[in-house]
């Protein structure tokens, strides 16, 4: 019998090799019930391969994965009944209405016609799509298709939902609606959600934890504040400063040289809004403030970064790239990996159809 604190996804030493290419390399990961987990990484990092192994659609080279205690390779059919998959490009029958698409999905998952209609009506209201229920799916915008996609996934009452770029190509208001819905599915329904995405801002807003994937390896995993603190423990401190002189934000050679002269400063840059971003190997707040005040600058803002996922991702990614030193151990380097990536895309494109087959 499972409880709220049980792990829903457990991955142990999971690897997938294509010849010498390590698409996924010794992955260990645990995702809790009701957790929203963001999986970040560039194309070819191993995110899609990991998803395919979780869904039992490709066998691992080594290691294993379980979903709610079920072996993803040996018990893939049972896993399929627990998992809903939302691809980045949701496909529906364009000549059928949104309602009819959901009813069809419900029937494919073993519901009677009456049960399918009732559940479709309830879910369309839940995702805010009742107004478009009788419109043909082919007329839907991308945001509407994504919401219908979430509704389609919910028809089978999943315990886990795996989403691939759920907010890509959607306008800001649509993004807010979808991210709010995702958070509600975890908080109110207790559904475990794993999101694979490049959208760092949205991942930061809704995820309980994130994992950063680079070249087949999970190089960092944890809450965003934890990852920021880990960087500081490794000697990386980040600061944002707004400084003015004579009422204007400053960014001249004299100002830059003054900042660079502070012991420990490694990087100085300017954001679009005029905020100065500084990175250092130690905590320079006191020295920085003293230098600015003594040079007659007015300090409007100064705070230490640590919860900005964009900076965290960039730093971990740069560290992983430096460690690899240009080696071709993962990702999509080389002709073999290119061929493997093409194969994975073809398999991934069939996921929606596979998961609509139901029980």
Model region roles, listed by residue range:
Residues 2-4:
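Pre-NBD coupling/linker segments of ABC/ABC-like ATPases
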Residues 6-11, 16-215, 219-220:
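ABC transporter nucleotide-binding domains
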Residues 12, 61, 263-266, 300:
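A short, local hydrophobic-aromatic micro-motif
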Residues 16, 267-270, 304:
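Hydrophobic/anchoring residues in structured secondary elements
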Residues 84, 101, 110, 149, ...:
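A generic structural signal for secondary-structure junctions
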Residues 180-279:
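ABC transporter nucleotide-binding domain
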Residues 280-359:
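C-terminal coupling/interaction segments
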